[in-house]
Amino acid sequence: PFVGNIIADIRNLQEANKRILFEGAQGALLDVSLGTYPFVTSSNLIGGISAGVGISSSDIDYTIGITKAYTTRVGEGPFPTELFDEMGTYLAEKGGEVGATTGRPRRCGWLDGFLLKTMAKSSGVNGLCLTKIDVLDGLEKVKICTGYDSQKSHEELVETMDLVEAKPEYIELEGWSEPTAGVTDFENLNHSAKNFIEKVEEISGTPVIMISTGPKRENTIIRQ
């Protein structure tokens, strides 16, 4: 049995013009309909809000997508930008990449900007929260995937999520030695970190409205 009548509670809050925040529990590529099937969960991400609490998608005013400054995955499934070298190990260790529920180590790779753009569009994301940018502190170079060298068109890859043989194409950016850790004002970030963020916005087609610079709540830059 349910603890209470959530649908009625939500409608009462709506009628009272209260702000309501819903939080998705999975990554977009684990969505049963839009993800890398069959390596998915049994539920939908954004669509699950309507099914779970009985509100219309038109009632959602703003959707924030959360992405790390690099890409991770737990368990099996295609991962075009996965790193099998020392850099992958470095990201995993510095980022503390262990599955919160399973305890399994996460696979790590460079940020997949192409998939970020694809899933931001399909999920109706209005703004991005970019986390763990501090994990990239101290690297001489950082990369972002902009697309793939594949026999299939990008449209076909998106439609089927057949990413097993996709070879990533990257842009390489200057890294930074000046730390971003703990910074709370965007203007106080170093030039290269700002450039990285701007490239994420350009490639994903979505503004970065929040930036996490550490594990604590106060380690956050709010731009909007």
Model-derived regions, located:
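Non-transmembrane, aqueous-exposed alpha-helical and coiled segments at domain scale
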Residues: P1-Q224
